[in-house]
């Protein structure tokens, strides 16, 4: 199919490119992993495994990591965990928030990521309402930030024709767009 051809093209990019695969825990991500497993990894794929702070999030991340290890030749270098919705960017704080990743010496934990990987690569992702909005809208924060729609102009046009409710809606989306840009520039790009 066309999607498999697109996936093949990504995998076969030259050495000057790295493919970043954000591996979620849904059916689509399982299908993508199954397809990549059929052809293998060529060393240019970086696997990002999202991880929330819940127990089930940890179990899903471990299962996903195990699938990727069967595909990836160099998992220590190419698997990276995104610690999603970190309440604070303070290292001590997110170390305790993500017990499913780091474990805790005083709390009994079944199995955590650090039980399977000696020094896992990771980065915390600060929680923000734009992340919640991105999930509801089915877009990444980056896509929301750099959407080319001029919501301000649309709001003015709607107001000029007397459609105040549409004008409010466009202002709402303009606000989200602005907040997403701020998040990308001031949080993600740091």
What does each model-found stretch correspond to?
Residues 37-41, 55-90:
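Conserved C-terminal guanine-recognition region of P-loop GTPase G domains, centered on the G4
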Residues 32, 60-61, 93-94:
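Residues at alpha-helix caps and immediate loop-helix transition turns in enzyme cores, especially N-
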Residues 14-33:
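Switch II (G3) loop of P-loop NTPases
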Residues 24-28, 44-62:
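Conserved Switch II/interswitch segment of TRAFAC-class P-loop GTPases
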Residues 1-13, 17-18:
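Walker A/P-loop NTP-binding active-site region of P-loop NTPases
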Residues 12-16, 34-43, 65-73, 99-103:
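Short, surface-exposed basic-aromatic patches at helix termini and helix-loop junctions that form
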């Amino acid at each position: 199919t066309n999607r498999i051809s697109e996936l093949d093209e990504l995998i076969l990019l030259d050495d000057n490119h790295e493919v970043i695969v954000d591996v979620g825990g849904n059916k689509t991500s399982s299908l993508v992993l199954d397809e990549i497993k059929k052809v293998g990894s060529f060393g240019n794929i970086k696997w990002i495994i999202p991880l929330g702070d819940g127990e089930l999030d940890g179990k899903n991340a471990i299962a996903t990591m195990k699938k990727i290890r069967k595909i990836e030749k160099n998992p220590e270098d190419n698997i990276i965990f995104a610690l999603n919705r970190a309440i604070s960017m303070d290292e001590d704080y997110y170390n305790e928030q993500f017990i499913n990743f780091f474990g805790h010496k005083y709390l009994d934990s079944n199995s955590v990521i650090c039980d399977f990987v000696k020094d896992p690569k990771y980065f915390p992702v600060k929680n923000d309402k734009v992340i919640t909005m991105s999930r509801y809208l089915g877009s990444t924060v980056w896509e929301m930030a750099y959407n080319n729609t001029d919501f301000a102009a649309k709001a003015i046009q709607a107001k000029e024709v007397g459609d105040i409710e549409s004008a409010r809606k466009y202002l709402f989306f303009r606000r989200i767009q602005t907040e997403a840009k701020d998040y990308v520039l001031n949080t993600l790009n740091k």
